[in-house]
Amino acid sequence: MITFLLNQEIRREDNLSPNMTVLNYLRTKVNKTGTKEGCGSGDCGACTVVLGEVVDGQLQYRSVNSCLTFVSALHGKQLITVEDLQNRDRSLHPVQKAVVDFHGSQCGYCTPGFIMSMFALGKNKPDASKEDVMESLAGNLCRCTGYRPIVDAAMSLSTDQPLIDQFAELERNTIKKLESIQDTEANLRLGHLTAFSPKSTDELAKLFQAHPNAKLVAGGTDLALEVTQFHREIETLISVNLVEDMKVCKETDTDLIIGANLPISDSYSLLKKHYPDFGELLHRFASLQVRNQGTIGGNVANASPIGDTPPLLIALDAKIKLRCGDESRTMPIEDYFISYKVTAQKESEFIEQIIIPKPTNDSFRAYKVSKRLDDDISAVCGAFDIQIEDGKVSYARIAFGGMAATPKRATRCENTLLGKPWTDANIKLAMQELYNDFEPLSDFRASQEYRSLSAANMLRRYFIERQNKNNQIETRVTSYV
């Protein structure tokens, strides 16, 4: 049974398929059809809803894609849909009124998703800047209205005062309700399908040993596609959503520690503080809805050759802490990837933490090439950490995604640079060595030639930026409206 708040109503559900998404639950079980399905893969945002949860005694709101969220993730949270925004006197919520006033809807299919993203933004950042608005809406697509009136509507809500609505008035009562259901059972069973929701790392380790064929799910932003896109049945799920000790985000004297269950959006501040380019890339990692659910641990465990974070972690010489039963081990992340979608992870073993060395200088850079600026998969992702002493390369770690069957270091390129003067001529030699490091495939995202040339040009860009630290040109397009 799972227990959660549907707006202000406590719901206890024990007859749901563990494979059911929140979108299907809303539309087929409780007749809340305002939430739409556009793509079923987390790309369009039409299905956006907002989840509220108690964090350190405060109510925190997150926009999420309901098409990628399994119902087990609702336990202990508040689920808010576009229908719930209407005031008790049936008047429009301030967000809804703004969209009407600024003519931000035409066919209306995408409008509920936009409104929920704007609602979450208003709750989290009432004084939102245009950059905040663009980030919040980057995961919502509109094919007929055009974005300017929608952005104008969102900007009209920006104020230095908290958003006052019925949710603000009921906040203390909502927190009490959520706190009252935290310790209730959180497992789901329907026929031969089961979803377990352990609440500690120790409990997770025991469960995974008892069910070694189970699928672990954190945010579910990738695993849910097996259900929504490929119509597969997942017999046993183990959700780590409630494992709070895997949501650590801290720094020691030497390292940054990121829990494998920490949402990407929660890791942003720490990573941006120490590695600005890492933070910049996370802004381009899918959409805010996906970042509010997905985790770096999941991005690593997925072992995709085009995952955005593994090349960066490899270039930074990061390590991962793995747990199996009562035993733990730590390994360099570059050793984790064996071949396409094959890792060094043993049966019943899972990633517990990602450990990133703190920087000793500002030599790290990361670049991503994709067809869209926001919410798109990489054609090539490159990460560089090259250190120069007395005009010569003393240290070099270069890694790419999208260039091989796994995220991989460019060792020939590195060796060409090590000990050599940091010059244009040597950079050109190293660029040529990248063609020996990798033989990328051609697919619908990019050809082999395009990938190879892009990777080489990333190295050249890195060289130019390092040579011209005080005269950098901004190449990022920050707004379309």
Where are these predicted regions, by residue range?
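Extreme N-terminal starter segment of soluble prokaryotic enzymes
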Residues: M1-T3, A396
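Short strand-turn-strand beta-turns centered on an Asx-Gly dipeptide
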Residues: L5-R12, V50-E53
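Short, charged low-complexity linear segments at domain edges
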Residues: I10-V30, L74-P94, P112-K130
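A basic, amphipathic helix-loop patch mediating RNA/tRNA/ribosome contacts
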Residues: P18-V49
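Disulfide-bonded cysteines in secreted/extracellular proteins and peptides
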Residues: C39, C44-C47, C67, C107-C110, ...
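C-terminal structural segment of proteins
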Residues: V50-V54, S63-S66, P94-V100, G104, ...
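S4-like RNA-binding module at protein N-termini
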Residues: L51-V82
